[in-house]
Amino acid sequence: MRTDLKLIYDWVPEKARLLDLGCGDGELLDALARDKNVTGYGLEIDPEGITRCLARGVNVIEQNLDEGLANFEDDACDLVVMTQALQALRRPDRMLDEMLRVAEECIITFPNFAYWRHRVHLGMRGYMPVSKSLPHAWYDTPNIHLSTFNDFEHLCRQKDLVIVDRAVGAGDYRDHWASRLWPNLLGEIAIFRVTRRRRQGATA
């Protein structure tokens, strides 16, 4: 399992109801169901990923995330997860709203465009960066909304959302002290836990 998925695995509580957006081959859901009695669904559009999910016995729905999550009711889940897909959506801000409609908390990971190697690649060489976290050339990339660590935190403030926890790391998805100290510069991958702000007077 990728190191970023291991971190998400640690953040997911026992017996949670989980929705995994862009679930890939279903590795995370499979491990959580087996080890933590987590139930839920994965959404995936890639036929190969869907086939692998089914082979694992993971509940998977073929769905384009750009179409939203209208087929899920408010608070249908405890947690929504999306790894390395936010930057490929037409409206990432609207998807964040949808994720926090379906669940009170979400976990999101994405490549940090302000990572120092990306800055050097663009600033010194004059080309769009290609790296472990951004492996595609500019002309064939699925990424249409590249953002930075600071950009995402600003979006959360605009939406009055609470960042519960965060982790950042290099292309191998390892968290380390230097990237935690200067995440926007040294963190190649951003991992956020975000929740809705509890309304005053609301009960748990």
Regions found by a protein language model. Name each.
Residues 68-74:
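Short conserved loop adjoining the S-adenosyl-L-methionine
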Residues 79-90:
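A short SAM/SAH-binding and catalytic strip from SAM-dependent methyltransferases
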Residues 1-15:
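Conserved alpha-helix/loop element of class I SAM-dependent methyltransferases that forms part
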Residues 93-98, 105-200:
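S-adenosyl-L-methionine-dependent methyltransferase catalytic module, highlighting the catalytic core
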Residues 22-24:
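Class I SAM-dependent methyltransferase "Motif I" SAM/SAH-binding loop
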